[in-house]
Amino acid sequence: MDTEMMPKFSSKDEEIDYWKCLSLKYKKSCHDAQEELQEFQEGSRELEAELEAQLGQAEHRIRDLQSENQRLKSEVDILKEKLEQQYAQSYKQISMLEDDLLQTRGIKEQLHKYVRELEQANDDLERAKRATITSLEDFEQRLNQAIERNAFLESELDEKESLLVSVQRLKDEARDLRQELAVRERTSDVTRMSAPSSPTLDIDKTDSAVQASLSLPATPVGKTMEHPFIGTKALTNGCGNGSPLTPSARISALNIVGDLLRKVGALESKLAACRNFAKDQAARKNYTTGNGNLINSNATKFSHSLHTTYFDKTTMNGLDPGALSAAIASPRAVSPPGLLPLSV
């Protein structure tokens, strides 16, 4: 190839010059290559030393990193163990908290049920309280009415006692009047036989008419035992005041006796109504016994105080409580003897 590229020389000197120039050229390039090689070798040695230093540093760093990695691995293992322990503890704690939560929910539901039951019981108690208060107010109202009625009946009984005393007195006066009329009839018969045309004939006729109008029965045994000591002067004089009664006074006295007897009959009807009221009170008492222990206790206390007050009042009024209760409790279909009305 070189031979092909070799130029053709015309002379040997020209060829020698050519080859000299070429050898100088190659020698110079060889010298340059050697210098470059030497520089390259020096650079490579420096680079090798630098790389070896870097390699040592890298190996030292690798060893440090490996030790650090080993330490971190051990720490990771420790942390894993701690995490597992913490997870186990957390799981146990969560399980316990869930159990406590379930128990708390159950207790909460029970408390809600208990609260509802208490509210229902409270509503029932409030309704019972309102019913008890209503029944108690009704009972107090009826009891106050009964107290007022009993007070009215006490006054009526006091009036009846006074009227009975007045009636008994008037009966005694009427009996005395009948006896006086009988005596006057006998005296009038004697005077009529002695003096037929006496001016006192009209008065005797009036006395006989009054005696015929009197139809009172005899005084009952019980009442005569109450007044066993009647003076003889009262029997002879009528009223016991020392002066004989005129016919008009006798007729007015008989009218008063008739009015009093009618009042006594009205009082007997009121007494029968009082007995019926006592029966109604007994029935109401039996009814109120089923309204509960509270009403029963209050009613017992109130009725006890009423009973004490009632009989204290009767004692203060001069009445016998036993006789009064017996008179109210014992039913009498007919009037007692000696209380028949007068026919005037």
Curated annotation (Swiss-Prot):
GO terms (BP aspect): cell migration; centrosome localization; chromosome segregation; establishment of chromosome localization; establishment of mitotic spindle orientation; microtubule nucleation; mitotic centrosome separation; regulation of neuron projection development
Coiled-coil parts of chain: 26-189
Tagged with keyword Cytoplasm: yes
Keyword terms of this UniProt record: Coiled coil, Cytoplasm, Cytoskeleton, Microtubule, Phosphoprotein, Transport
Gene Ontology CC annotation, any one: spindle
Entry comment on modification after translation: Phosphorylated in mitosis.
Molecular functions per Gene Ontology: microtubule binding
Compartments, record wording: Cytoplasm, Cytoskeleton; Cytoplasm, Cytoskeleton, Microtubule organizing center, Centrosome; Cytoplasm, Cytoskeleton, Spindle
Function of the protein: Required for organization of the cellular microtubule array and microtubule anchoring at the centrosome. Positively regulates the activity of the minus-end directed microtubule motor protein dynein. May enhance dynein-mediated microtubule sliding by targeting dynein to the microtubule plus end.
Family affiliation: Belongs to the nudE family.
Protein name per UniProt: Nuclear distribution protein nudE-like 1-B
Taxonomic source organism: Danio rerio (Zebrafish)
